[in-house]
Amino acid sequence: MPTKSFIFVLKIKIIDFINIPDSLNRRVLEKTIIDLVGSIGYSIEKLSYNFVSKQDLLKLNKKFLNHNTNTDIITFDYSLKKALKAEIFISMWAVETSALELNQSIENEALRVVSHGVLHCMG
């Protein structure tokens, strides 16, 4: 009697985008991060990008960094050697404000900030 073979595909998300605005292209952001990390010789264990309000990021900045100022990004880095693991919090208010000031699209500015966050983990 012939035996049956089964192939299971397990897809593990190594990059999460939480509360990502509809205006941002998740796939473009993901590809940019993967290409950047790989080009520098690192790997990704798990990255969580959290898009939060100006007020929420200010609260995190006060609580964990003792800074009473607005910022565009805060990175909590849990990486070991060259395997990146981090929680990254991004203020869409700051992204939108910087995009206007720098005459950039919101997506281009978001790409810059998302890249900035992962670079925090690489020194």
Annotated model-derived regions:
Residues 116:
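Nucleotide phosphate-binding/pyrophosphate-handling subdomain across enzymes
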Residues 1-111, 119-123:
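An acidic/histidine-cluster motif and surrounding catalytic segment
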